[in-house]
């Protein structure tokens, strides 16, 4: 069965965010329905970082990018959400 691989780029809503705590909150909100395969930090500047979230889901109407974005938008410390990349993959 094919799967969908997503990469989301999220930016914090404030400068003094605890990135390790934010990563745990993101994983806690998305999983188990949306398994997080990794979260990378990307330096933006002046100590501010973006987080790149890697998610792989089954290809199904039950799993949507709209739902992922809705979940992420409800996290207090997230100020911006961008679907940076997605593709269909087969294993």
From Swiss-Prot:
A GO molecular function held by the record: translation elongation factor activity
The entry's keywords: Elongation factor, Protein biosynthesis
CDD domains for the chain: EF1B
UniProt KW Protein biosynthesis keyword: yes
Stretches that traverse the bilayer: none
Family: Belongs to the EF-1-beta/EF-1-delta family.
Its biological purpose: Promotes the exchange of GDP for GTP in EF-1-alpha/GDP, thus allowing the regeneration of EF-1-alpha/GTP that could then be used to form the ternary complex EF-1-alpha/GTP/AAtRNA.
Protein name stated in the entry: Elongation factor 1-beta
Organism: Caldivirga maquilingensis (strain ATCC 700844 / DSM 13496 / JCM 10307 / IC-167)
Taxonomy of the source species: Archaea, Thermoproteota, Thermoprotei, Thermoproteales, Thermoproteaceae
